[in-house]
UniProtKB/Swiss-Prot annotation:
Protein name in UniProt: Ornithine decarboxylase
Listed cofactors: pyridoxal 5'-phosphate
Positions bound to substrate: 341-342, 378
Protein's cellular compartments: Cytoplasm
Protein residues bound to pyridoxal 5'-phosphate: 229, 266, 296-299, 407
Record's catalysed reaction(s): L-ornithine + H(+) = putrescine + CO2
Known EC number: 4.1.1.17
Amino acid sequence: MPAIMEKNMLVSESLRTTELLGHVKPIDSVVTWSSPGSSRQAIGEAFKNTIEEIERAAVRGEPADSDAFFVADLNGVYRQLLRWHAKLPRVQPFYAVKCNPDPKVLALLNKFGTGFDCASKGELEQILGLGVSPDRIVYANPCKAITYVRYAASKGINLMTFDNADELYKVKQHHPNSRLLLRISTDDSNSLCRLSLKFGASLDDTGKLLDIAKSLELNVVGVSFHVGSGSYDPSAFLDAIQRSRQVFDQGLERGFNFDLLDIGGGFMNDSFDGVADLIRSALDTYFDPSIRVISEPGRFFVSSSFTLAVNVIAKRKLDDEEKVMYYVNDGVYGSLNCILFDHQHPVARVLKCGSRFVYNDLVGTGQHRCFIWGPTCDSLDVIANDAHLPYELNVGDWIYFEDAGAYTVAAASCFNGFKTSRIVYLDTDILD
């Protein structure tokens, strides 16, 4: 399908969806859309320009900031928003702030009326600071501190989740006017992060919890679930929607009038279209159109829109080893914490080798086997223990990692005195 035709189809569906959701600004009325191909070219130019400026500063004898850096394609976030509304027009996204709380990403999503999934007072404060209305926030943490519950009540943030009896008693005392979603457990055995190990009531317990909520005169308005962060099993959504239908029926039996279903997150970029088709069909089968449906996508919006560049700061060859060891200026204590916390496996690619920029070079992985270490003094700080690159690198060369927008900047630390990586933004005019 020609890119411009695909764009127009997405925009048409997005405009209809934003009208239904009451968004202030039509999605495509205020920005210039760019295709993925043009964005990739812009990313390459941003890498080249930034590195050349670093090198010019070094030649001038100025302190050169050769630290690792991201290139953030804001238009990429926007394209994913269009794609979401085209494939899941019934489902209003509430962006999972924990995934990447970058201020410009949040501002972009806020501009187009996206809701926000928050899990702490800090996230609530950040989103309210953007001028977001409290009714566009879901406090999606089933186990909240009392002080945080009080804060939510003071700010009019009413929609929140629970999965246990103690939370109900807590909410009754500190936020009795809340609108509650019962978080249920799911089969998330095929996800990167199995959230049901920690959260979610089983179907054996949901009826009891609804009885307690009824006795406390609390307003339970629906059901929420999460199939796990980074789910690779489309059938997990079908199973969770079927379970939600059972809990809706339990609520009806107890006199509740549920009108909201939160289908959580876990959406992967490469499997999204097929998963969305399944979700649309399941929602039509099990839930009347009058039921409002929201979701909590995170990585789907931001993962592919951030690319990380790291500099080779040291190189070590061992006589008895075939592999070369490279040491770079970001690692698992910084932007690549996703290796530990999100079970990701970033793929290293050569960005600059000697005087050659080779971004997006499709040479292949090559036969040069290597270790890639982060910069800290901890041996846990290993990015790859068997990477394959097409070229042997030297100190001063650059490597890049794509799909670096999810669970990277959010948890980066300054351990060992290393700074967090800066961000170079593309398409900032989209925020005007």
